[in-house]
Amino acid sequence: MSEMQQPWSLVGLTEAEYRRVVEILGREPNPTELHMFGVMWSEHCAYKHSKAALRRLPTRGEHVLQGPGENAGVVRIDDDLAVAFKLESHNHPSFVDPFNGAATGVGGILRDVFTMGARPVATLNSLRFGPLDEPKQRELLRGVVAGIGHYGNTVGVPCIGGEVYFDESYRGNCLVNAMCIGILRPDRIHRGIAAGPGNAIMVVGNPTGRDGIHAASLLASAEFSGSEAEAALPTVPVGDPFAEKMLMEACLELFETDAVVGIQDMGAAGLISSSSEMAARGGVGVELDVRKVPAREEGMEPWEFLLSESQERMLVCVKKGREAEVEAICRKWGVGCAVIGRVTDDGMVRVLDDGRVVAEVPARALAEAPVYHPAKAEPAYLAELRAFDWSRLPEPEDWNETLLRLLGSPNIGARAWIYEQFDHMVQAGTVLGPGGDAGVIRLGAAVAPGAHGLTRQPPGEGLPGRSGQAGPPKGIAASVDCNGRYVYLNPRRGTAIAVAEAARNCVVTGARPVAITNNCNFGNPEKPEIFWTFDEAITGMAEACEALGTPVTGGNVSFYNETSGEAIHPTPTIGMIAVHENLDRLTTPGFKQVGDVILLLGETRDELGGSEYARLIHGVLAGDAPALDLAFEKRLQDVVLRAIHEGLVTAAHDVAEGGLAVALAEMAIAAAEPSLGCQVSIFLGEGRVDGQLFGESQSRILVTATREQVGRLQALLMVEQIPFRVLGDVTADGRFRLAALAPGSGSAHVYRRQELIDLPVADLVRAHKEAIPRWMDA
């Protein structure tokens, strides 16, 4: 019998891991126990290849109430409010079944947040697909977007932002990362723990079926060979968002009692994962009878009950004698529930089948899988790509056409085709929705602290401050960011850039970054080059989080994003949370009024590595990721926040994909009036013109200021030693004009002016708007 036919390999274990199981138990595991170890020691559940590296991330900070290890991280906003948030992937299921994979990804991240005792108030998403000119990729995009919209809209949680990229590296593995934000009281955090021998273990939510069995161990913990997608269709669960809504309301009401000891979402690996993790955290055991689990299918085996990933289910540890209260609340909301077991004091997960013991395993053994330290090797491609000679690339003859092509790229253009399928105004708390630098919600618009938890509050009402009096309206800004091309070219720096840009996107709205969650999407960690990339990315993430003061509160690692041996670009997505102390100072990117002065903060270098311009116009992905000075990044962000809150800035926008010319165009596109345009000039040195226009140098922010305030702004920038240039003015003619100034012959103070771009803003709007619809609506 070959190893692939051995029982352990059929559940995803290696022979060495199987031998360790035998050593732990002191005997051969029976089939049910083997299934239990198979899922709990899978990469998806155990993080066995990533755990050692993740320990290097900074996880402590003045705002952090709950760091990694729980269903979601929690940060304090003030004495009355905290935010729970989490970012997680549903990549493999979404490639197999785009609609259901994406929908259940939203459902899972919502449960992760409301399990903590928080009411979900916003979601974001980070999506990756192959090129849109391929029918398969358009099919994936349609299915994923429809699934996200169906689930989120039905539950009634607004989608306030996100990002999407299209690149050849995601052709065989799309990425679907979902983020959720919830509001709770700082003293009302609920955790996934079982405690108190004799306390009841209850399952709350939908009945259990066979859907999703082994999805964690065999779908999300292995790479595709190209044929698995069709064969694995039955492993993707189907979600019910209305049931999720009822489950959420029931759980939030349960939290207003003191009957709940602990609660855990039954997500990946289902009942066995939630029960063993709760027991291990509490240092106790649990005894479960699978025949007491409400089932929707006949003849289910014990291991099927344990591994089912049927959606919309929770496992709850309830104080002994309080079961009837839980049942009454569940009945009120039309949610099923049943007592299926009890907490024990022996540290064992004991599984019964109608009273007969069918499995008995130490809870800690299931929860503490082997930790590996894979071999590392720097990829050979890096040296070749970094040696690329940029002088080989000709500069465009038509700068107007080049700008329009970039604005029409699906990686830069408007995402309205996507986010218009999502409800971003439900709950009446959205201040800035999708399409800007970051999403922003108003605290107090939908929920506020009550005597026992969270209660409804009319839109627009302020929240009490520390003094108990109404203060300035507060908000939460959030963004998700990662440029996989940067990480491909320089994993350490590219990941640091992802953290910096996620923070910068919040800062330009006026919000101060406080913490991150992450979703690390990589290929097969057993390949030394892939693991080297992952390890470098974690180093870059740690360095950036330390420099910017944004600790990591949790996240997710998704390995094995490969098909036929071809891995995705490494994509460590960052979800950033920032606090807006005064929404009256909220800043948006669009030009506001004629005569405002346009300034560029930060320095532009001759950098084209990883840029959208190089890839789209020249078909080149080469060079190095843009340079990043984290100390300067922190200073820049602090100064911009100060300028915004002192009322010195009328608009602010991060310079990112597409570079300076695209960022300026985006400010014109988002202008308060369609008649607004701009007249700007850039100074040329010895570098390339395209590098000045479309290079993606980091730590740059565009701002506008009134003529009355621009002097104060310039003085602040000079005192804080922030380099800046006055580029020009907002105009009233509805045109976008960009000229280059080059040193003339003779005097150093004489400049030769060359008009590079002169276009109606309406043309920019049209190109930007049609970037995705021209493919999807063709």
Swiss-Prot record:
Pathway named in the protein's UniProt entry: Purine metabolism; IMP biosynthesis via de novo pathway; 5-amino-1-(5-phospho-D-ribosyl)imidazole from N(2)-formyl-N(1)-(5-phospho-D-ribosyl)glycinamide: step 1/2
Gene: purL
Active site: 44, 90 (proton acceptor)
Annotated source species: Symbiobacterium thermophilum (strain DSM 24528 / JCM 14929 / IAM 14863 / T)
Binding site for Mg(2+) 1: 88, 556
Function recorded in the entry: Part of the phosphoribosylformylglycinamidine synthase complex involved in the purines biosynthetic pathway. Catalyzes the ATP-dependent conversion of formylglycinamide ribonucleotide (FGAR) and glutamine to yield formylglycinamidine ribonucleotide (FGAM) and glutamate. The FGAM synthase complex is composed of three subunits. PurQ produces an ammonia molecule by converting glutamine to glutamate. PurL transfers the ammonia molecule to FGAR to form FGAM in an ATP-dependent manner.
Superkingdom assignment: Bacteria
Catalytic reactions of this protein: N(2)-formyl-N(1)-(5-phospho-beta-D-ribosyl)glycinamide + L-glutamine + ATP + H2O = 2-formamido-N(1)-(5-O-phospho-beta-D-ribosyl)acetamidine + L-glutamate + ADP + phosphate + H(+)
List of residues binding ATP: 47, 86, 518, 555
Record EC number: 6.3.5.3
InterPro entries referenced in this protein's UniProt entry, alphabetically: PRibForGlyAmidine_synth_PurL, PurL_linker, PurM-like_C_dom, PurM-like_C_sf, PurM-like_N, PurM-like_N_sf
Region Disordered: start-end pairs: 455-474
Binding site for substrate: 89-92, 111, 309-311, 558
Family, as annotated: Belongs to the FGAMS family.
Annotated GO MF terms: ATP binding; magnesium ion binding; phosphoribosylformylglycinamidine synthase activity
Main localization category: cytoplasm
Binding residues for Mg(2+) 2: 112, 265
NCBIfam families the UniProt entry points to: FGAM_synth_II (TIGR01736), PRK01213.1 (NF002290)
Protein name, entry field: Phosphoribosylformylglycinamidine synthase subunit PurL
GO biological process, one term: 'de novo' IMP biosynthetic process
Compartment(s) where it occurs, according to its Swiss-Prot or TrEMBL record: Cytoplasm
Keywords: ATP-binding, Cytoplasm, Ligase, Magnesium, Metal-binding, Nucleotide-binding, Purine biosynthesis
A Pfam family that the UniProt record links to this protein: AIRS_C
Subunit structure: Monomer. Part of the FGAM synthase complex composed of 1 PurL, 1 PurQ and 2 PurS subunits.
GO cellular component, one term: cytoplasm
Enzyme class: ligase
Record flagged with keyword Membrane: no
